[in-house]
Amino acid sequence: MERPLHLLLVFLSSPWLLLLQGVSSLQFTRDDFPHDFAFGAGTSAYQYEGGAAEDGRTPSIWDTYTHSGRHPEDETGDVASDGYHKYKEDVKLMSEIGLEAYRFTISWSRLIPSGRGAVNLKALQFYNSMINELVKAGIQIHVVMYHMDLPQSLQDEYGGWISPKIVDDFTAYADVCFREFGDRVVHWTTVLEPNAMAQAGYDMGILPPNRCSYPFGSNCTAGNSSVEPYLFIHHSLLAHASAVRLYREKYKVAQKGIIGINIYSMWFYPFTDSAEEIGATERAKKFIYGWILHPLVFGDYPDTMKKAAGSRLPIFSNHESEMVTNSFDFIGLNHYSSVYTSNNNNVVKAPLQDLTADVATLFRVTKNDTPTPVFVPGTIVDPRGLEHALKYIREKYGNLPIYIQENGSGSSSETLDDVERINYLAKYIAATLKAIRSGANVKGYSMWSFVDLYELFGGYSTWHFGLVAVDFDSEKRRRQPRRSASWYSEFLKNNSVIRVEEDGFVSAASHAQL
């Protein structure tokens, strides 16, 4: 049910008192979180850096995708937020806001332009300089090694992630990252959102590397929607586990870091209380959460997936199962919203079937929406969904250490007076605290995003997620902090009081981000 957003800022000298409606009534400050909990914000290399053809960087699959005209807005990330040139200014802004942590990704095709072999010295200078700036600012560093930007050379050579050859190349790339940056980087994430990339990139072909097959996807020049999503995840897990083993054997004693993997998360509510709808909801959870977490905890894929995909689902050898099991120190969670789910009665078992048919579930953002068989990012503000997701993980897979690595609200408006974003963030931060008090082992929270970015589906003009606005019409990509940056700063630096009142679902601007 749609309800208006309500926000009242009451200034009682200092700190601020923020009254919001959202999760059940809760009043809190920064000090209510554990002493080692870190609040931050994030960016991603292709969306942030720019400098696409500078200093030895070579094309990634994202460059190929956007330059082929497949992006809906026909825009590229060639300049993006120009972080390649403006990172020092950005770190200064982070410090002024009071960020305790910053999560960014490394561009593989910048660091190792050929995908393997020689390291780009200019890239080393860039990442070392940025890391050093963060260290000087006292900001905790969280590095992601891969987010959908494979060097195009490896995609051309052997098909990238659908080939087992990727395991050795990714491990060698990770080795360079650990060796060059690990003396200052403590928090490592191997792969970001593989469960989302599987459908978007390899079943539907709507994101890089734009692989799909008829009749399941369209506008693809190559691919196999029946098997490639499963190969991609399988090799992602093996590459992740190989990198973790390398880190633990070669670097962990000296560097004392931790390493994990990230999953895209949404919460699912059955459309009705029927057994059929509840079954579809549980099946969707297995494909979103269990596809990654089940092998990491139990060494194999969920039985639900084995039954649905059959022989198309790869099998772990005993050695691979042992390597994958417990190959993490934490799980990164990207969470934005919730959706309604129902059984897809139109799916009939056929010799040729894709991931979407295997899930056999329909999704609705609201109960009045037309259902779609594709995992659809939600647009409702539902902080309880985050609580449910954390509880589900704890009950099914144990009380795993979790970093919320992305959570945020996007708006089509470029306004600096982003009250809706403040509303959203306050509710989800409150939900995080409630989950911690209920026993969830959440170690950190990173909002999405630090600055406005080149958005994966929306380009420059459709959605703006940043605490800091970026003028994409300006050659200098001028920065200007939004009201949400001031609010976040008051919470982090001045221990301002936030009170969130119970309300339930609240409709807001889209905050879905893959």
Swiss-Prot record:
Residues 1-25 form the signal peptide. It catalyses: Hydrolysis of terminal, non-reducing beta-D-glucosyl residues with release of beta-D-glucose. Keywords: Disulfide bond, Glycoprotein, Glycosidase, Hydrolase, Signal. It comes from the Eukaryota. Its EC number is 3.2.1.21. Glycans are attached at residues 219, 224, 407, 494. Disulfide bonds join 212-220. Gene3D superfamilies: Glycosidases (3.20.20.80). Pfam families: Glyco_hydro_1. A beta-D-glucoside binds at residues 47, 147, 336, 406, 448, 465. This is Beta-glucosidase 21. It comes from Oryza sativa subsp. japonica (Rice). The lineage of its organism: Eukaryota, Viridiplantae, Streptophyta, Embryophyta, Tracheophyta. The gene is BGLU21.
